[in-house]
Amino acid sequence: MNEKHILGIDGGASKVFSQLYIFKDNNTVIDQSDTYECRYDEINGHDQSFSPVPLNVQKNEMKDNTYKISNDEKMQSGIVVKAIMKSIEYFTKDKIDHLGFCFPGIKMKEKDGISIMANGPRNPYMLKELNENIAKNIGLNIILKKIYDDSLSCVNGERFSPKGKLKEISDAIYIGGGTGIADGILYNKKLIDLSMYKNLKKSWEIIMPNGDTIEECMSLAGLCKKWKKRKPISIDLLNDLFDKASEKHEMASDIIETAGQAFQLLIDERMNFFKAYNRFPEKIIIGQRMGKIL
């Protein structure tokens, strides 16, 4: 029996997860390692006060294909690359046949870089930098071929993982994420790429009545910033928000109520997609970290 040893790397806005899987020929998982986590703030040089370039500026630069990446943004994206490399190095004692890598944000046309990033630094040359580091510093005769969308990867995880909740499901909505939001649609057993449908906006593109995006209203980063903007984003800060809301603190209660409205709006937006095709989702799956937030 031939086996494939695949290292999966899941980059996010605040950290990187990596895990080694062993597959049979039919893509059935037969074994897996424990998850390794590397936070960006563990890497020397990380800038806790870094603020992403405004989205309207990012969109204009993508449209004109003229990216003005500041030194601060380059430095912060370098921290991300180092964290990803650390995540790969952790598993070099094991056999690795293939590498798979997903990351949030809008990708470059060739899926080799990040052109828009709502919760972090852009890096149009991310794949090139990673592959150069893999060859030079690790010595693996393997390259990353593309950057997969984190939202699509989340849905695929639910479809193919032994414990996945979307096995044998034709139509479903997935909403997950951590610092940001990752959501996806499974339609007629096919994974929908939101970027390929003009009428399907991502959570950071859907505007609430208060002028904020859905992601700003219900993600970990968004909730923390609304609660105490100057403090580092953390689960502890989120728990403090929930505790104050349970005590009827007015500002905390308003933030939580708006988060619930944002969640409902996102569900309504995704339901409208199915209604347009006279179908109805069999399941709505909430990711583990998003479930904790909700």
Which sequence ranges carry the predicted segments?
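N-terminal phosphate-binding loop and adjacent alpha-helix
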Residues: 30-94
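Glycine-rich phosphate-binding loop and adjoining helix at the ATP-binding site
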Residues: 73, 77-81, 94-171, 294
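Adenine-nucleotide phosphate-binding core of ATP-dependent small-molecule kinases
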Residues: 65-95, 224-285, 290-293
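Short glycine-aspartate micro-motif
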Residues: 4-10, 96-100, 171-176, 285
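Glycine/GP-enriched mid-protein hinge/lid loop-to-helix segment characteristic of carbohydrate kinases
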Residues: 3-5, 17-59, 135, 143-146, ...
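Glycine-rich phosphate-binding loops at beta-strand->alpha-helix junctions
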Residues: 12-15, 101, 107, 118-121, ...
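Active-site metal-binding loops of divalent metal-dependent hydrolases
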Residues: 151, 179, 290
